[in-house]
Amino acid sequence: MGNRVEFAKMNGLGNKILVVDMRGRADRVMPQAAIALAGNAETHFDQIMAIHDPKLAGTFAYIDIINCDGTLAQACGNGTRCVVQALSAETGLKAFTFQTLAGILNAVEHDDRTVSVDMGSPVFDWNRIPLSEEFHDTSRIELQIGPIDAPVLHSPAVMSMGNPHAVFWVDRDPMSYDLERFGPLLENHPLFPEKANITLAQVTSRTTMTTRTWERGAGLTLACGSAACAAGVSAARTGRAERKVTITVASSPNRQALDIEWRERDGHVIMTGAAEWEWAGQLDPQTGDWQREQQAGHEASVS
């Protein structure tokens, strides 16, 4: 295998994830390797979740989260669920604490194999999201796409869930909007110095919503867990929905759903949903060269 490490191709509601086992190594998955893997039809991904040895006492691992353009991401809820499922299959453990670029994540796998991830507390301060302009009320900011007198999208709620999010409210199915056209413009808007994830959210009842997301550094994606968290929090914050909602991810296979709860007692956001193992292989973290396992692998494990 040479310089190769084990990896598993997984998905969270269709969000394509490569879970890479970098434990016992001092190097990391390089940007050029990520770009090469993203450019291959079989290994194309939305995020790489690279599992490293822990840097902090009391944590199981440090997780590097890498976008398909080679940049680092602070959070990936769907990817975290995949990591938990893989490590649970390997170790038999059900509860994990991880360190990421954004901080500490706690997660647990349930008996039905769904995974709950404590995504931490949302950040609403404009300079910590961050925004390039001062807004005292980030539940509704001045930003729109389209004519001034008839904007297609306008007045998003903005926040950070470890990464910047803008949630635009829409009155029909999010799939009916041309997010492929608007997404890149909004992701790279000067208002977002670190770029932003762009989500269209339709509130369908006090406890249900539908979303679609253009993901920072990944583009149009089938699902984005942190975006679902941002949408759920924003809906509760603006009085559109309760603090506990089921969010249908419109672009996911069979329109799958995530349960999002913005806990009142501590302000943390809990995301619960499924993850799915697809296949396993080995890859070179420097170049992105890879090979698929010839024999049937052990499901959902990367070791």
UniProtKB/Swiss-Prot annotation:
Location(s), subcellular: Cytoplasm
Keyword Amino-acid biosynthesis applies: yes
CC annotations in GO: cytosol
Keywords tagged on the record: Amino-acid biosynthesis, Cytoplasm, Isomerase, Lysine biosynthesis
Enzyme nomenclature, EC number: 5.1.1.7
Binding site for substrate: 15, 47, 67, 77-78, 163, 197, 215-216, 225-226
Pathways per UniProt: Amino-acid biosynthesis; L-lysine biosynthesis via DAP pathway; DL-2,6-diaminopimelate from LL-2,6-diaminopimelate: step 1/1
GO molecular function terms attached to this record: diaminopimelate epimerase activity
Primary localization: cytoplasm
Residues annotated as the enzyme's active site: 76 (proton donor), 224 (proton acceptor)
Keyword Metal-binding: no
Coiled coil (residue ranges): none
Protein family membership: Belongs to the diaminopimelate epimerase family.
Entries under PANTHER family matching the protein: DIAMINOPIMELATE EPIMERASE, DIAMINOPIMELATE EPIMERASE, CHLOROPLASTIC
Task performed by this protein: Catalyzes the stereoinversion of LL-2,6-diaminopimelate (L,L-DAP) to meso-diaminopimelate (meso-DAP), a precursor of L-lysine and an essential component of the bacterial peptidoglycan.
NCBIfam families referenced in this protein's UniProt entry, alphabetically: DapF (TIGR00652)
Name the record gives this protein: Diaminopimelate epimerase
Protein's gene: dapF
